[in-house]
A protein has these predicted regions:
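Intrinsically disordered or low-complexity boundary/linker segments at protein termini
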Residues: 61-66, 86-121, 219-231
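Charged helix-capping and loop-helix junction motifs
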Residues: 77-80, 152-157, 209-214
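Acidic, proline/glycine-rich short linear motifs
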Residues: 1-17, 137-159
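Residues at the starts of beta-strands that form the adenosine-phosphate
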Residues: 35, 105-106, 133-137
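Structural beta-alpha unit
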Residues: 24-62, 164-215, 219, 223
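Anionic-ligand binding region
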Residues: 119-126, 160
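Glycine/threonine-rich flexible loop motifs
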Residues: 71-76, 205-209
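Short secondary-structure boundary segments
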Residues: 66, 140, 198-200, 229-230
Length: 231
């Protein structure tokens, strides 16, 4: 049954009240130093409207959460976030409900070491690391039982080093059959502030977001994730 005009107006009014409260809260937390612009859109799909907005406004990134007040909201937030990661062209930063804000000092890049010249957006990565003056950790998860240090591994690692030598990245090779668990444990142990992934088909992003139990892990983690797409 289509919504009535009265129902639509009520939804818009409710959204306006909530977004105004959020704007005021953010303004206080930022000390009034950040210009905050709010906008409400009525759309058939969240991702479709976000894609249109990104196309016209060219934001640096889209920031999304993974949890709402109700079970339905949590499901919708999680689904929309995953769809945004897969389909939006601009970077998507996922901020879990348990995340605490502090200066970004350590950034991890989850990498499968496959054709890195074509599959890693080095310019965006360099800009991010330089802007925050952060340490960069290159993380490669290798399934147990597979040969970890192959000729390809050496070649691809050298390619990354050639591109990012002045940033002095740290390399970590981890043997694990549970990609998401290994990343979570490394992030906690080494106090990473942000984990970057580069979504592509059959890559690490699918292992993180495809299965239901890993979706739950991501939604419960304290570590913000940033999906950066290739240009």
């Amino acid at each position: 049954m289509p919504y009535s005009l009265e129902k639509t107006d009520s939804l818009v009014t409710d959204a306006e009240e909530k977004i105004l409260r959020l704007k005021n809260d953010l303004s206080v937390k930022c000390g009034g130093k950040v210009n905050i612009i709010t906008e409400i859109k009525m759309a058939f799909t969240v991702i479709g409207e976000l894609a249109n907005y990104c196309s016209s406004q060219k934001p640096y990134a889209v920031v999304m959460g993974t949890q709402g007040a109700t079970a339905l909201e949590r499901t919708l937030f999680g689904s929309n976030t995953i769809m945004a990661i897969k389909h939006l062209a601009c970077p998507v930063i996922v901020v879990p409900p348990k995340a605490k804000f502090h200066t970004i000092k350590k950034i991890g890049l989850a990498c499968d070491l496959k054709k890195v010249d074509a599959n890693i957006p080095f310019s965006q990565l360099r800009s991010l690391i330089t802007q925050f003056k952060a340490e960069l950790y290159i993380l490669h998860i290798n399934p147990k039982g597979e040969k970890g240090y192959t000729a390809e591994t050496t070649t691809e690692t050298r390619a990354i080093q050639n591109m990012l030598y002045d940033l002095h990245p740290h390399y970590r090779f981890i043997d694990s059959d549970d990609t998401e668990i290994a990343l979570e444990q490394f992030a906690q142990t080494n106090k990473l502030d942000l984990l970057i992934t580069v979504p592509k088909r059959h890559n690490i992003i699918d292992k993180i977001f495809h299965k239901s139990h890993t979706k739950k892990l991501v939604m419960q983690t304290r570590l913000p994730l940033m999906a950066v797409h290739l240009n």
